[in-house]
Amino acid sequence: MQGMNIAVVGGASGFGLETAKLMVRDGVSKIVVIDINQERLDAAKGELAGKGTEIFTVVRDIARAEGAHASFDAAVKTAGRIRSSICAAIYPRAPLLEITDDMWDAENAINIKGTYHMMVAAVKHMQGHKAEGEVSGRIVNITSVDAFKAHPQNAHYAATKAAVVSLTRSFAHAFAKDQVLINSVAPAGMATEKAKSLGFLGELAAANPLGRAAEPAEIAEFVVMVAGPKNTYMTGEQVIVLGGYIYA
């Protein structure tokens, strides 16, 4: 990924931050981390700095069009041409019969609308760099195995991730002519700090044939591959990384 400029939405913590770390490891030139939380952004910048990559941060709420487009515009202003854009998002839980309107609104705003608006901003930018025989840009959305499997403990999240799978396919089909490659990576449960703090690791291990949750870096490697220069042809695909979970 040397010489590439990357934007990571939701990259100040959790899986997004892990992905940013691997991209820095692989030598990206500039990385722009977009998040709603300034304190987490400051901490993430400290973790990513000092390894040869220029680190920029943008604090924005991407739940509405103006915030999403402003965040991407800021990324371009600070880093120049963005070669790849990665969009990660939230992971709340609620019992199936207790999902409130506020929960639905928050989930839809970030996971569906936010992802949609970030893709619009990225595609418009990448269309401006179309060149014969070259990839104009790459977009990777983080979905979930829950998009393909019943998950009553997390149904609103699963529904939004299924929507993102559909959006990914539609965008990929529409903008293949512009050489913009758009895919998603769908992990099963990961051993993130949040999952650890909520006591989910035992549950995740019991549900997985491999007997453990994935380490975030194991999944992030696939994001790096799909977002990187070795991907010159794949678009509209869902890379499902789940340790056999969906077949259990």
UniProtKB/Swiss-Prot annotation:
An example Gene Ontology molecular-function term: oxidoreductase activity, acting on the CH-OH group of donors, NAD or NADP as acceptor
EC number: 1.-.-.-
Active site: 157
Record InterPro entries: NAD(P)-bd_dom_sf (IPR036291), Sc_DH/Rdtase_CS (IPR020904), SDR_fam (IPR002347)
Binding site for NADP(+): 8-32
Keyword terms of this UniProt record: Oxidoreductase, Plasmid
Protein name: Uncharacterized short-chain type dehydrogenase/reductase y4eL
